[in-house]
Amino acid sequence: MNPDNPPSIQMIADKVGLSKATVSRVLRNIPGHKAETREKIIKAAEELGYTSHPIMSAVMSSVRFKKTSEYSPIIAEIHCQPWGRKRAWNMEILREHIHKQAVQLGYRIEEFHWFDPEMKPQRLMQIIRARGIRGVILEHFMASNMELDVDISDLAVVSIGGGLRFPRLHRIEVNYFGGLLTAFKQLRSLGYKRLGVALPRFFETMSEFKREGALHIAHQDMDPSDRIPIFHMEDDEPFVGFEAWLKKYKPDCILGVGRSLETQLAELGYSFPKDIGFVHLGWHPGYEELAGVNPNWGTIGETAVNQVVEQLNRNVCGVPEHPLRILIDGSWVEGPSVRLPESITVTESKK
């Protein structure tokens, strides 16, 4: 076979006596066909010169692997947050989109938990292999220095979040750095000048202080008198010194995460946006009364599935030599916790 003139799908279809559409679906690893049909098409494709095609290799591997599995291809979603922790709204959005995207690509999701007290990680990986699962999504470790002591050499694995330090896998992350810069740009366009950032130190450590780094960059474009240092909320006593920080630096808008910060400001007598603006840097639909930056957890989940499937299609497993780090940009969300631009206010007042 001339490598510059590979066989067409129609040629394979003619050889096996099946439709062109059926052959095309099998070669793209789309479920819905009997194992015998898939093997017949793969064999014919190899005989016609497809043996070295990377996708073909992945499909053939998949055919062999599914003999020990249920028919539908499966991706394991391993929850990596602390056992017993209530799942936050953003994690539910992530989970929902992981499932939806898997279905779109012809897969389904089975869920596991890394910190299941009745199952060690080594046992978990044995179960995954026994079920014929080859694709794995590690869903957001909360710790900032996690290391995996398990063999993943035969699995296509993607990690969500930056908590996993070893091994270095392909990972999908929130663009914390860009999200803060987006918020600053929007707020300054609304007339805010003194922007104060208050964040849990735990979150900053987990994200490698990306927002604090972005704050340093944003300050370079501000009058020195308007630069306010970050307020780190400590784990045990998050608001010790917070009121003093507010009085000393007098921010006209606060950027942070979580209900506790919003509540603390209200208890100190601040109302939004009359006394001070408030922006939630981890916005989701549960915060519809606030302005914020939506990290787009749904897109993060979809991208994680895409990356796992892409590895499966290329028959690539194990720890990558050069891991990808994909950052998902956040989106600015308008809300009543920040004031409107003067031009808009004037226009509305005339109506």
Question: Language-model features: where?
Answer:
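Amphipathic helical "hinge" segments at domain boundaries
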Residues: 2-4, 10, 48-124, 201, ...
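Periplasmic-binding protein-like
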Residues: 76, 130-140, 194-200, 229-232, ...
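Short beta-strand elements in bilobed, periplasmic/extracellular small-molecule ligand-binding domains
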Residues: 102-115, 196-198, 209-239, 280
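Flexible loop/turn connectors
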Residues: 246-351
